[in-house]
Amino acid sequence: MTNIALLQSLGLFDARVPRYTSYPAAPVFSGAVGADFQAQAIEALDPAVPISVYIHVPFCERLCWFCACRTQGTQTLAPVEAYVGTLLQELELVKKHLPAGVKAGRLHWGGGTPTILSPELIHKLAQAIKAVIPFAEDYEFSVEIDPMMVDEPKIRALSEEGMNRASIGIQDFTDIVQSAIGREQPFENTRACVETLRRYGVHSLNTDLVYGLPHQNRESLAATIDKVLQLGPDRVAIFGYAHVPWMAKRQKLIDENVLPNDMERHELANLAAKMFTEGGFERIGIDHFARPDDSMAVAARSGKLRRNFQGYTDDTCPTLLGIGASSISKFEQGYLQNTAATAAYIKAIEEGRLPGYRGHRMTDEDYLHGRAIEMIMCEFRLDLPALRARFGEAAETMVPRITEAAAKFAPFITVDEAGSMSIEAEGRALTRMIARVFDAYETPEARYSQAS
């Protein structure tokens, strides 16, 4: 049996599994954990330890058909201005519970499209955030940027407020692919955006690509990657397109007949990995690449790579505070998601309530399983002695799961004398499926994306 046939027989093209950007995955969250938990977790923060802050801006001028994010379209700035006002109100609510002296080691603006904000709104929001949670000395402020919705005044405003990393969504530069996903973005506009960012001192650059898009093939993806390499990013993420029209209604606009088949998707992923590694990048986890001197590559080599809701990260802050509709916070005590619908979120804030509406309170077992899965996702191994050192006898519950994974996914898993498990390079496409063996929660597969 060929390697690809063996991968296929193990369910590579059929399984739907979590991306494990959190553990447990978000579908496990419960309405039993809400605003009271949110307030208590914020009040328990240690001012001596910097936190990460995520700001969600759920607006776009145009809705890309492939996107499954919580976003809404608007052709005017009025709802955006109103929403920023609500963000400022939420910050004031958070401030009531926040211990004095808490600082932000990381600040990330995502969406939607944060660059839909005008320069005036950029300044207003950034200054309000810093008034409540000032930057730590060695901070990172990153912003997701749409090259078609940004100009020099916006970049200048972001730079003046401290942005030092930009993340540019690209997906694919091929005209027919862009037309099929409702996203027009010429390479020239993207290159001009990058040049302007660098002119304003933003030298750390991430780019996002997607494989498995309609009409995409090896030639078109290779041409896109060639152009991306010309931009000189420090990091690249390339995600598999998840076609879930039953969850993301706008995906019904995509013609399923021109989507690459499973084998073609697999070949596209392998092509991207080959081109980026040959282009001087180190492979990070299952879908990221970074220059050897980038902090993410350094973290990966030193065993400090972590997972969060943006994917892989070198962020060492133990707390993520989410601000805005649908944003998710991660506290030592567990996870908390803000009300997802923008109107309901605004209503909660206007009533003077913290907007947390569902979450999960972590147990000792959750911490153990979560760390085991994070090891697998970040390092392609499970270090059993390290789990024993941290969790004591409870780590022994991983032994039968290691045995199960080794039997189910042979010959792609090896187990050493210490009981630690490693995934061979040829089997790393199965990583999410292997991680699921260590997931103690049973959730419907329909909630998740394809494993490959």
Curated annotation (Swiss-Prot):
It catalyses: coproporphyrinogen III + 2 S-adenosyl-L-methionine = protoporphyrinogen IX + 2 5'-deoxyadenosine + 2 L-methionine + 2 CO2. Signal peptide: none annotated. It comes from the Bacteria. Residues 45-278 form the Radical SAM core domain. Its EC number is 1.3.98.3. The keyword ATP-binding does not apply. It is found in: Cytoplasm. [4Fe-4S] cluster binds at residues 60, 64, 67. Its cofactor is [4Fe-4S] cluster. GO terms for biological process: porphyrin-containing compound biosynthetic process; protoporphyrinogen IX biosynthetic process. S-adenosyl-L-methionine 1 binds at residues 54, 111, 144, 328. Binds 1 [4Fe-4S] cluster. The cluster is coordinated with 3 cysteines and an exchangeable S-adenosyl-L-methionine. Disulfide bonds: none annotated. S-adenosyl-L-methionine 2 binds at residues 66, 112-113, 171, 183, 208, 242. InterPro entries: Aldolase_TIM (IPR013785), Coprogen_oxidase_HemN (IPR004558), Coproporphyrinogen-III_oxidase (IPR034505), Elp3/MiaA/NifB-like_rSAM (IPR006638), rSAM (IPR007197). Keywords: 4Fe-4S, Cytoplasm, Iron, Iron-sulfur, Metal-binding, Oxidoreductase, Porphyrin biosynthesis, S-adenosyl-L-methionine. PANTHER family: COPROPORPHYRINIGEN III OXIDASE, OXYGEN-INDEPENDENT COPROPORPHYRINOGEN III OXIDASE. Belongs to the anaerobic coproporphyrinogen-III oxidase family. Monomer. Involved in the heme and chlorophyll biosynthesis. Catalyzes the anaerobic oxidative decarboxylation of propionate groups of rings A and B of coproporphyrinogen III to yield the vinyl groups in protoporphyrinogen IX. This is Oxygen-independent coproporphyrinogen III oxidase. It comes from Cereibacter sphaeroides (strain ATCC 17025 / ATH 2.4.3).
